[in-house]
Regions:
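Glycine-rich phosphate-binding P-loop
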Residues: 249-277
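Long, charge-dense accessory insertions within large macromolecular proteins
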Residues: 173-229, 306, 323-330, 339
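Flexible beta-alpha connector loops of hexameric P-loop NTPases
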Residues: 151, 322-338, 410-426
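N-terminal accessory targeting/assembly segments
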Residues: 1-193, 198-202, 213, 615-620
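Post-Walker A helix-loop "phosphate-sensing" segment adjacent to the P-loop in P-loop NTPases
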Residues: 278-289
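N-terminal pre-Walker A segment at the start of P-loop NTPase domains
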Residues: 216-250, 293-294, 298, 302-309, ...
């Protein structure tokens, strides 16, 4: 391995040569306090920037081990260090020539604290520093060029002066703000802890008092600055927790079952639901929603007309389409509002729930009696662990009327009179939502300002009034008794069967031209997979472009490793997720990737399900 001085010499010698000569600097370099690794060098100044890493050993980084001793803390610390590096890099780097010349950048960061491959903690095994952590940081560098020739002196400055300065400012514990770092780590640990407590209290979400839910604008996810009304729980829904770091915290607990959020237009309903949707992830301190936590399997469901659907059994909701179209294996290139919403629900159930129909369901809030639950406590730990894992996957559905198909949500008395049941393919959600809970343990939180018919099926009704929440359950029940909706229930005896699907391996093809794998990600909503474009604009719980990058890689892994024409989609996703859990996200790429962020099985399934070439066979 050569040192910093020789790298500098080399760069100065490269001055004015053609850009391709930069390839020569690929390799590892011993800097005074860390190792610089140049994994990959870009082909020209306009291409994606070059991939770099620095490794700072524990005796230099000196990060106290209590900051990474639990999994939550470690993930939070990695996120924190990435943000510090980002700040220092923005401050230090500047444009130095054509194209991307001069940039030094880590992965893009938003409000969420996610497990990211941008930073890793390296613990030491030498005895003199065994309580300290080191850091590996991955980032990209736009190697400088004037036109297409190398700017050697600028490159030497960037690599041999700027990078050491950034490292020194952001990755050495002595230069960090210790209190802020601790707060980051403790906040995330508390949020994870809170999320774990939900099931035991039979809650699906918790919104802490004092939370700031509204965002600065439709394109700015930071908290609204002025005029934001802080959240206060209605007294009758108030719960308390004693967090490991923060101590007592109060807020609104949303119980398992069916919850309506009602209220006038512009009174904060959607803002509350949006915070709950993203409560499956942790947020940075100061976000305002850092203690809004949601069941980890909560899935936003919406209408998404125009999407493709591949062989999904939407028959629990939709039957007898015109022209005799099959809804047991429903294929379309262009779904309607209602069929897309039905497919979105069934697809979430397909990867979330293990058993259906007459077999016992596994939802914590579902059909198991207390008696059977007690019996289970006698069984081995392993069995309990397995059950707990399965329970963690049972979806909670989140629906907002703003993005739902009206004819999927409601069908009132008058319409039932005019259009007979046998002329209407759709069984509306209102007739299925109770069965979902009773048969499968699937809870629903539904924003519905427009139809009081739902009072009949709701367990809890929360009203938003001037951005304040009230528990109006009793009143809604009284009204439901006073004015009958007079609807005929159309849902039948039970929710119905969920048919698992086996993907046809050839229908997922990441290759393009001569390249075996060509995947490309744009922001959080577009993914190019081989020759296909996947539109994920309606998959609202992909919060970070790094998640989509990792999803793209996981799709390739799913195809190459596990799609064999026999396994179901759900089994394939289980295997991929288990690999990531045991080996880390690095198994998704052949070189050290700094731009992956952790995602959920639901979003991986969502991407596969939106691939227009996907074809499946039903597993009966
Ligand atoms: P609804 O779904 O009830 O029609 P929204 O949730 O879309 O209402 O909110 C309407 C507007 O009010 C949005 O601009 C939102 O940012 C803002 N808003 C929501 N909650 C609050 C709050 N707690 N304090 C201040 N403004 C809020
Ligand atoms: Mg709304």
């Amino acid at each position: 391995m050569t040192d910093k001085q020789s790298l500098k010499q080399h760069l100065l010698q490269l001055d004015n040569r053609g850009y391709k000569a930069y390839k020569e600097i690929q390799g590892s370099y011993n800097f005074d306090e860390f190792t610089l690794i140049i994994d990959w060098v870009q082909g020209d100044p306009f291409a994606s920037p070059s991939k770099f890493r620095v490794k700072i050993p524990p005796n230099i980084a000196r990060i106290p081990c209590e900051l990474f001793q639990s999994r939550s803390r470690e993930i939070a610390l990695r996120d924190y260090l990435t943000r510090q590096f980002d700040k220092a890099a923005r401050h230090t780097s500047s444009k130095r020539g054509t194209g991307k010349s001069g940039t030094i950048a880590v992965t893009r960061l938003g409000q969420e604290v996610l497990e990211r491959t941008s930073a890793l903690i390296v613990s030491s095994n030498t005895s003199d520093s065994e309580d300290l952590g080191g850091v590996e940081m991955r980032f990209s560098v736009g190697l400088p060029a004037g036109g297409r020739s190398i700017l050697g002196r600028q490159a030497a400055e960037m690599l041999c002066e700027d990078i050491p300065r950034i490292v020194s400012l952001s990755l050495k514990y002595s230069s960090l703000n210790a209190a802020e770092c601790r707060r980051h780590v403790e906040t995330v640990e508390d949020a994870d802890w809170l999320r774990e407590q939900l099931a035991e209290k039979r809650l699906v979400a918790f919104v802490a008092d004092g939370s700031i839910l509204p965002r600065r604008s439709g394109v700015d996810n930071r908290p609204l600055l002025n005029d934001a009304v802080a959240f206060v729980s209605p007294p009758s829904l108030k719960v308390e927790f004693n967090c490991p770091n923060r101590g007592l915290i109060f807020g609104m607990g949303i119980p398992a079952g069916i919850t309506l959020i009602v209220g006038g237009g512009y009174h904060g309903k959607s803002t509350l639901l949006r915070a709950i949707e993203l409560g499956v992830y942790n947020r940075i301190p100061g976000d305002g929603r850092e203690f809004v936590v949601t069941n980890p399997a909560a899935v936003k469901i919406r209408a998404e007309d125009g999407r493709s659907v591949a062989g999904v059994d939407i028959s629990p909701f939709i039957n007898h389409l015109p022209q005799g179209r099959d809804t047991v294996q429903f294929y379309t290139e262009n779904a309607s509002g209602s069929t897309s919403q039905a497919a979105n629900i069934i697809e979430a159930l397909e990867v979330g729930i293990r058993k259906f129909g007459n077999e016992q369901c596994t939802g914590f809030n579902g059909c198991q009696s207390d008696g059977s639950r007690k019996k289970e406590e006698g069984k081995g730990n392993e069995e309990q662990e397995r059950r707990k894992k399965e329970q963690d996957l049972v979806p909670v559905l989140l629906v907002d009327e703003d993005t739902a198909a009206t004819n999927f949500m409601i069908r009132d008395r008058r319409m039932q009179e005019l259009i007979a049941k046998d002329k209407e393919p759709i069984t509306p959600f209102i007739d299925k939502v109770k069965q979902l809970y009773a048969d499968c343990g699937v809870s629903t939180i539904l924003v519905m300002g427009g139809s009081g018919d739902y009072f009949d099926v709701a367990d809890t009704v929360i009203s938003m009034d001037n951005f304040q929440a009230y528990n109006v359950t009793e009143k809604a029940k009284e009204i439901a008794n006073k004015y009958s909706a007079s609807r005929a229930a159309e849902g039948g005896e039970s929710f119905g069967e969920i048919t698992h699907r086996v993907p046809v391996p050839a229908s997922l093809d990441p290759s393009r031209g001569r390249r075996d794998v060509r995947v490309k990600v744009r922001d959080v909503d577009e993914l190019a997979f081989g020759n296909e474009e996947i539109d994920l604009g309606a998959v609202e719980q992909i919060a970070d472009s790094g998640q989509l990058r990792a999803i793209a890689a996981a799709m390739v892994c799913a195809k190459q490793q596990y799609m064999d024409g026999k396994r179901t989609l759900s089994e394939i996703i289980d295997l991929v997720m288990a690999d990531i859990e045991t080996e880390g996200m690095d198994i998704l790429s052949s070189f050290p990737e700094g731009d992956f962020a952790m995602f959920r099985r639901f979003e991986l399934a969502a991407a596969i399900n939106r691939l227009r070439s996907l074809s499946v066979v039903a597993k009966r």
